Amino acid sequence: MVSFILQTEKLCKTFSNGGVMQHVIKNLDLEVEEGDFTVIMGSSGSGKSTLLYALSGMDKPSMGKVIFDGTEIQNKSNDELATFRRGNCGFVFQSIYLLENQTVLDNVLTGALIVQKNSPELVKKAKELLEKTGIKETSWNKYPNQLSGGEAQRVGIVRAIINNPRILFADEPTGQLNSAAGNDVLDIFTEIHKNGQSIVMVTHDLKTAIRGNRVLYLRDGGIVGDYRMPRFGEDDIKERKNKLTEFLGDMGW
């Protein structure tokens, strides 16, 4: 039986632009299966990031429902939403938000202590995750301004996953990285997905989108394309790229 971790019903989001209401998301229905790596694509202004923020509870919809594991979240108070996010969601953004006055290890632990109590086990887990994502012990006492962009983004990912979130949201996580650093970060997302993590990611980049097993294409605030693939690594990479490119071409990408 299919298990949906996230659903929307008639989701709408509007903004006032010079006194004129702009409909960014329009009556959008969506079901996200638990364990899927869902990629959201579309042209600039199509509503990608707006949808991501509504799905994650970081922004409330104007109308409609957002349902997380059977529970509606759109009418929760800001405090209730903050509590919900801490226990269920991890976030990785294009702009890397690390606390400049804290070391790498302390940045990760600060994120963890929002949910968990400090303990030797927690510190051990933080160090293990940093190692797994390529941040060696020699960097644990460095400060953010001593890291490369790729290193800082990897620290951000560790901070996002240390609390074992049910779902991980990412908004253009490789957008400010060079190609090599971007590939390293994508390898981490692929490994996380192989371990059963649900991921919803916004991107405009083909080499990022190819890592997912589902690609949604947005236009004018609605889903106009829904393409599914095997999990990354389970099919021929060249054929995978060609088929996804063909789908995106049909969408006008």
Regions found by a protein language model. Give the residues of each.
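Conserved catalytic motifs of ABC-family nucleotide-binding domains
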Residues: 164
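Catalytic Walker B motif of ABC-type/P-loop ATPase nucleotide-binding domains
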Residues: 168-171
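Short coil-to-helix segment of the ABC ATPase nucleotide-binding domain corresponding to the Q-loop/switch region
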Residues: 102-111
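Conserved ABC ATPase "signature" region
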Residues: 72, 120-138
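Conserved ABC ATPase signature
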Residues: 143-147, 151-153
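Helix-to-loop junction immediately C-terminal to a conserved catalytic motif
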Residues: 56
